[in-house]
């Protein structure tokens, strides 16, 4: 699995977690593996778990930098992608910042709109 595919998998887990905050990332992964629609990838699991564990800090950064936007007004797709990018930028040292931003923007173009991609790039 490529890094981009792993990020996409992590994004899916982070996005799904936004609908089910009571379920742990580990439980979500286990259910997905049992249903056979997810092959686990070590990097994807690391990203999803770290984003979940560090969500309060990540969300605080989003709120401080999304000028004119409250977190609850940001779409779940954009919020999940921002969480993914900030997780990589802050907690995964091997990934350059510009790569994290670019990957989140590219995923936004795939799962959201050009406007969402521009918003993510701006934050």
Where are these regions (language model features)?
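N-terminal interaction/assembly modules
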Residues: 1-123
